Amino acid sequence: RDKFPVIIAGGSFNNDTHITKTRKEYCALIDTLIKKCDPDKVVFVIGASLKGYEKYLLDHAKKFEIFAFVPATISKARLHALQRCNVSIRVAIEPSSMGIYKSIAYEIFKRNASVLLALDGNSSVVNLVQEAKNAKYSCRIFVNPHCKMLKKKADSLLGYVTLLQDSNNEEDVLKYIHA
């Protein structure tokens, strides 16, 4: 049986001018997932940049398999940086990082149940949330309400998205991870 995918969107799904500021409560959520999930049953999925919550995950989830979706035209420097982090790399068909949500939708949402933690981003992560909502298999979506674009998207998908609270998110997220 395949591992259960947990997508962490929070660093790669921005334009170059936006810097993800990590919040301690969401880093604590990631810590809890690392502590309570089984590395033999869960795989984490991130984007191509080594920033924000995705970087936090890479620094702390050493026992887990982590897949990084990268655009088809990734620079050699970024590719080497990802390889040094010991992640598995999936090359998306899209040439830019703003379009990799399409490959995540195809590779994950159309093939497996999953969990999406949308912690930061712009239109690309909003599109990822929409794709998760339209998934062939169940994708439980959790959104950071402090990110204005994500909060607006969550409000438009009322009933399909869970807004993360400032604390006590761990058990709510863990009950949807099939591992």
Q: PLM features: what roles do these ranges have?
A:
Residues R1-K3, A179:
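N-terminal intrinsically disordered, low-complexity tails enriched in polar/charged
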Residues D2, G10-D166:
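Acidic/glycine-enriched connector segments
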